């Protein structure tokens, strides 16, 4: 789940955001490459259309409908989908609490040395629980401007709650040919996901904390990340997401709808839905 949200919510970072398509209105279509630990880059696509958004990978699509205040996570392999709503946030938090409680029960019967080792690993990976308030997000300049693809960008370290979470290279919207209005769906999706991941405590993705107004104030210009590098834990794993192109075109018919024949699943099946191929 963390890996999925690193792209879907953080991009996550750090990856880190669509009316039903087919109309005459052109949507903003962004193509990205995502490289996991130096492996061959995999294509990712994001479609933005007013208050709607669709993010696609080879295995999973995430659709945000601002008009319905819902997110659908679609899995083409088995034609299933998970629906996230504001009302489902409490269910997520309850399941997370239940899972943590079960883990603590299992740890209690282990030898002390082994238990402490596992607890330390869990603390490093998950943190110590949900803070009372969202963590503070800061942008720290991380070197001179550089070129990523066709764009000049300024590198910043994103610091969440006093800890470095990811590095982004941010290009000016004017250079990208984008406007804030075109990013409305992305901003609304980020706000929705921030509420959802807050229910998960320390598993929240730092990229869902991005607020365009706050970011503009912090860095001094309206911008958008053209490259995001997110590191996970102390294991050295990192995911690099790079913007490759921006186009305007009509979205495919039904781009923001649940495809016919898909079956809704519950939260007990969420791990299977979000598991990588």
Where are these regions (language model features)?
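Bacterial N-terminal signal peptides that target proteins for export
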Residues: 1-11
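Mature extracytoplasmic/luminal segments of secretory-pathway proteins
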Residues: 4, 14-15, 166
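Bacterial N-terminal signal peptides
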Residues: 9-20
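Extended soluble regions of mature proteins
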Residues: 25-277
């Amino acid at each position: 789940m963390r890996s999925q949200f690193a792209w879907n919510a953080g991009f996550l970072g750090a990856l880190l955001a669509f009316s039903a398509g087919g109309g005459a209105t052109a949507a903003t279509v962004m193509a990205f490459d995502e490289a996991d630990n130096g492996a061959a880059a995999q294509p990712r696509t994001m479609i933005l259309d007013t208050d709607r958004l669709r993010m696609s990978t080879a295995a999973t699509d995430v659709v945000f409908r601002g008009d319905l205040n819902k997110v659908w996570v679609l899995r083409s392999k088995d034609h299933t989908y998970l629906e996230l709503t504001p009302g489902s946030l409490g269910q997520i938090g309850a399941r997370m609490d239940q899972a943590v409680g079960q883990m603590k029960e299992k740890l209690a019967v282990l030898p002390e040395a082994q238990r402490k080792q596992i607890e330390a690993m869990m603390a490093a990976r998950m943190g110590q629980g949900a803070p009372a308030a969202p963590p503070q997000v800061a942008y720290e300049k991380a070197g001179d401007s550089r070129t990523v693809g066709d764009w000049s960008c300024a590198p910043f370290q994103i610091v969440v709650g006093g800890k470095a979470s990811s590095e982004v290279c941010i290009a000016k919207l004017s250079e990208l040919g984008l406007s804030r209005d075109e990013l409305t769906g992305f901003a609304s999706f980020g706000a929705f996901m921030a509420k959802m991941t807050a229910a998960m405590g320390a598993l929240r993705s730092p990229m869902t904390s991005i607020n365009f107004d706050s970011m503009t104030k912090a860095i001094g210009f309206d911008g958008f990340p053209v490259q995001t590098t997110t590191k996970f834990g102390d294991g050295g794993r990192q995911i690099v997401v790079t913007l490759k192109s921006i186009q305007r075109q009509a979205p495919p018919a039904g781009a923001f709808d649940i495809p016919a024949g898909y079956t809704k699943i519950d939260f007990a099946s969420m791990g299977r839905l979000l598991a990588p191929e």
